[in-house]
A protein has these predicted regions:
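Glycine-rich phosphate/adenosyl-contacting loop at the front of the ribokinase-like
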Residues: 1-41
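Conserved phosphate/ATP/ADP-binding segment of small-molecule kinases
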Residues: 100-182
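Conserved post-catalytic alpha-helical subdomain immediately downstream of the catalytic base
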Residues: 196, 205-248
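Charged C-terminal helix
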Residues: 230-273
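Active-site cofactor/substrate anionic-group-binding motifs, chiefly glycine-
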Residues: 31, 35-84, 89
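Short pre-catalytic strand/loop immediately N-terminal to key active-site residues, enriched for Gly-Thr
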Residues: 183-196
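Glycine/small-residue-rich loop that forms an oxyanion/phosphate-binding "nest" at active or ligand-binding sites
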Residues: 69-118
Length: 273
């Protein structure tokens, strides 16, 4: 299943429109290239509808939010919906400020998303209207653990059913769920949290997988999350004592570039609930 999703991505090479943040935009573009797709990073309202129309998928990331890009996100999201293109939302820091939270809610009201990907604090904020987001990282009280995994899975399924989107909650244990099934994924390495933008890269990667597998968004999102986590493991195994987080970032992108569908299928560590 994951193998097929990755094979489709490599063979179809979709063009992915990213309205993302300027902290990680270069890494996101390189991640899209590494997986076999092509990126375009356009965020001016005068062209986003045109750009979205020629792309196979759209990735919306609110990491460096401003009033100009909010307009662009709404225009692009609605155009993608009209065309039936998959749309990914990364609600970076939702709950940390009124602007971020209000914008995330407006996007959810006005755009139908294929996948909503965030940490547990961000997703809980979207689901409940309140949260304890600490910057853009999950608050320590909101970690998904083996002890609370059943409850977290039930929460993810309920939110997915309510929104009609696949919900991807990423952390030490990742959950990717629709209203009926959930993938619990245990790939990755703790050092990934030392690299700014691994989540942003994952959202761009998810948009690429979804564009190449439009009829199977749950499996596409799960494949993206497994691939990113596996890349984190492979990259960490390459590090020498003199390497740090910048080298690790590059090795993660390299790992996706060099990853084969067979390697993903073999290395993915998940269960379905």
């Amino acid at each position: 299943m994951l193998k097929t999703a990755f094979e489709n991505l490599r063979s179809r090479s979709p063009l992915i429109h990213n309205i993302t943040n300027y902290v990680t935009v270069n890494d996101c573009a390189n991640m899209v290239l590494a997986c076999g797709a092509s990126p375009i990073m356009a965020d001016d309202a005068a062209e986003v509808e045109e750009i979205t129309a020629i792309c196979g998928g759209l990735n919306i990331n609110i990491g460096t939010l401003n009033s100009r890009t909010v307009t662009s996100m709404l225009l692009a999201g609605k155009k993608a919906n009209q065309l039936g293109h998959p749309v990914v939302l990364d609600p970076v820091g939702a709950g940390a400020s009124h602007l971020r939270t209000d914008t995330a809610f407006r996007l959810l009201r006005e755009v139908q998303f294929t996948v909503i990907r965030g940490n547990i604090s961000e997703i809980k904020t979207l689901a409940s209207g309140a949260g304890t987001t600490k910057g853009v990282d999950a608050d320590v009280a909101d970690k998904v653990t083996e002890e609370n995994l059943d409850n977290a899975v039930a929460f993810a399924k309920a939110f997915a059913a309510r929104t009609g989107a696949v919900v991807a909650i990423t952390g030490a244990i990742d959950i990717v769920a629709d209203g009926e099934r959930a993938f619990c994924i245990r790939n990755g390495h703790p050092m990934m949290s030392a690299v700014t933008g691994t989540g942003c890269q994952l959202s761009a990667l998810t948009a690429a997988f979804c564009a190449a597998n439009p009829d199977k968004p749950l499996e596409a999102a799960a494949a993206a999350v497994c691939a990113m986590g596996l890349a984190g493991e492979i990259a960490h195994a390459r590090l020498t004592p003199l390497d740090g987080n910048a080298t690790y970032r590059n090795y993660i992108i390299d790992a996706i570039y060099n990853m084969t569908p067979e390697q993903l299928e073999k290395g993915a560590n998940y269960e379905v609930r």
